Amino acid sequence: MEGHSDMEIIRAVKGSATGEINVHLVARDSAGSHPHLPTTTFIIPTNAATLGLPSTALDVSYPREPVHVGAAERVAGSEPVTATILPQLSTGPGTNSTVRLLDWTGVSAPLAGSGMRFRINEYATQNMIEIERPRSPEQRHEGGTAGREADIQHPDVHKDPQEVIPQEPSVDAGSCKCQTCGPQQSIGLDVGSSGDRCPQPFQKRSVIVENSGCTVASELIKPMKKRKHKEYQSPSEESEPEAMKQGKGKDPDREPTPGTSENEEWSRSQLVSSEKKEGWSWESYLEEQKAVTAPVSLFQDSQAVTHNKNGFKLGMKLEGVDPQHPSMYFVLTVAEVCGYRLRLHFDGYSECHDFWVNANSPDIHPAGWFEKTGHKLQPPKGYKEEEFSWSQYLRSTKAQAAPKHLFVSQSHSPPPVGFQVGMKLEAVDRMNPSLVCVASVTDVVASRFLVHFDDWDDTYDYWCDASSPYIHPVGWCQKQGKPLTPPQDYPDPDSFCWEKYLEETGTSAVPTWAFKVRPPHSFLVNMKLEAVDRRNPALIRVASVEDVEDHRIKLHFDGWSHNYDFWIDADHPDIHPAGWCSKTGHPLEPPLRPRESSSASPGGCPPLSHRSPPHTKTSKYSFHHRKCPTPGCDGSGHVTGKFTAHHCLSGCPLAERNQSRLKAELSDSETTARKKNQSNLSPRKKPRHQGRIGRPPKYRKMPDEDFQALPPSVVHQSLFMSTLPTHADRPLSVCWEQHCKLLPGVAGISASAVSKWTIEEVFGFVQTLTGSEDQARLFKEEMIDGEAFLLLTQADIVKIMSVKLGPALKIYNAILMFKNNDDVFK
């Protein structure tokens, strides 16, 4: 049977001249039924002056904590319980052959083999400032024998610096400082009592003196290292620091082991990915590639500007040119600011029309600019052109107009001499460079003018200056022996004559002397620079000059396939010298490494550095495989341009199999150009839409009268709303394969099929989906067909169409699933 003994009182009494110190250990049975056991007294010779004990007795009471004594070590409580302190002897000079019991570190020192610690007070005497509480039986059992053996150390081993107790400020000789409560005044230092009564727990565990029935010199108890307090942790919490310790010093690019946590692998992969991007630099890359960058002198001032700060803020409103219709000015809102670039949103229209410009772009103007210059401004959807007012619009939308000083001043730019509105010239079709067509000057702003091709829609228009290599004086084609494309539907295209045409239209030609000759650029092949990815304009990548012409360069994105190469003007605002991104604060996409490109295959999982956040073990769905498998693609952008993100190969603008689709959208195909070149008198492409030239409305068949009854604050709801999340790294809010089963009539239907639905078909689908005829009737009243239905956002359904949130979520999720099915089927 196991017995217990309590460490009750140790009385240290200052001895006589011999300096004896009697240490009494009194053991008592826990039940109190046995008399006191025999005690063992150790007489340790030392000088009282060495210890500096006060004249009064020093009583030290230990907390009454039971000490386990094995039954095999004592029989019926007859054997004494012995605790021994082994002093460190010092025979150096000046020690007077005394025993140095305290190991001084600064002004405090612990007593070896005990939990007591002493310090020197302002009177140069030693006071005990701390005593540690013995461990409970449960704590001792937790440590076990292995823990005791690991904690025992020799007196000459230095302690861990973390375990050195800092000096307590201003504690006088008569005070005891509790670890938790603070100083306690007492005449006789009774630390054990104050510690017992302290309502707050001790922060450290004590070292217990183990008892032995038979002890020899080699088995004397040695000073023990204090064990740090360990908070209770759940198994998952305990495994995390262990995994972190195991991960130190290992290769960050190693493959995950079976015992490695998936969450840890994802966190590590994100860190590695960010380190790769942050660790990339132009200097090291140029040294590695043995290449040179394009000198800054080769760029225009607008391309190389880095000293100006981008002062535009989110939500600011301004006026700007529509890139798809360069002759039209729209109300725009700053939807995103990145470095020295802006993403602009057309107020009242879908985000699929958003576009990027530099902050110094000449195509943007402050609010009210159109009134001062006499231009025509297209108001947001729902506003009448003649009733639109900037002041009223800003109040209704609670928005701020972009300050005028943020725009590039164009007042110092003189107008082009000789170019006036209505004058005729010959111009190259930028979408079909092999064609030179009859054109007119339709607008002049500062030093630029707008070139418009006669009798064609404005989608072919472009802005240029007098030195543009794409414009020529009247009669240039005849002198060069090149065919001239007459205006569309010209009565007698075979016999087109400039003199007759100018007389019929009552116009004049731009003087020949007004045209300026632009010298060719000086870019060389293999020069490095930074360029906007035209397939995903939000990104700027490291590029190289692959080929050159007089006024154009062919760019290649380093590390990517040559299928992505494209031609661009040498003065285009989307190319910048090396280092432009870092100076303006814009992220730069580093070159795609061969390892990255080979580690991911079409249809497979992306490499570790491109992983999505892992799902937990309790999660029902995993979005790891919903990531775009194209190497180096972050999931942003879409091949159709209608969405801001994608997660399938069919929607990736960087996928090689989609390049034909992209080229068809970026410019007309070479086949079409050849056909037009062979028959230069054949009509060009018909206008993309009949009637009023401009951006197609959000609801194609919704009459304008329906919007007049809506307040402006309700109409302007499409800002910052997207059909898909902008960041594809974030998991989608639904799992298509599972949730499509919960929505009737959604599975197996693609967006291409929905776009052909009639108004009645949309009405029937909404009625079946929501089970409410009233909700479906709203779509019928608004004359929403399939194509308009796919353009709806959640905010449109809830706020504009006043559909309740529950049915609106079903409808919007159905739209997202249609689009996802379209990607899957393709």
UniProtKB/Swiss-Prot annotation:
- Segments carrying the region annotation (Disordered) are 134-155, 220-272, 586-623, 663-705
Which stretches are MBT repeats?
280-380, 388-487, 496-591
**According to the UniProt record, where is the region Interaction with monomethylated and dimethylated peptides?**
453-460
Ranges for domain SAM: 757-821
Q: Where does Zn(2+) bind?
A: 628, 633, 646, 652
Q: Ranges of Basic and acidic residues compositional bias?
A: 242-256
Composition-biased stretches (Basic residues)? 612-623, 683-700
What is the recorded post-translational modification?
Answer: Ubiquitinated in a VCP/p97-dependent way following DNA damage, leading to its removal from DNA damage sites, promoting accessibility of H4K20me2 mark for DNA repair protein TP53BP1, which is then recruited to DNA damage sites.
Pinpoint the site Mediates recognition of monomethylated and dimethylated peptides: 429
Q: Where is this site: Positioned at the entrance of MBT 2 and is required for recognition of monomethylated and dimethylated peptides?
A: 432
Molecular-function GO term, any one: histone H4K20me2 reader activity
Name of the protein this chain belongs to: Lethal(3)malignant brain tumor-like protein 1
* Biological source species: Rattus norvegicus (Rat)
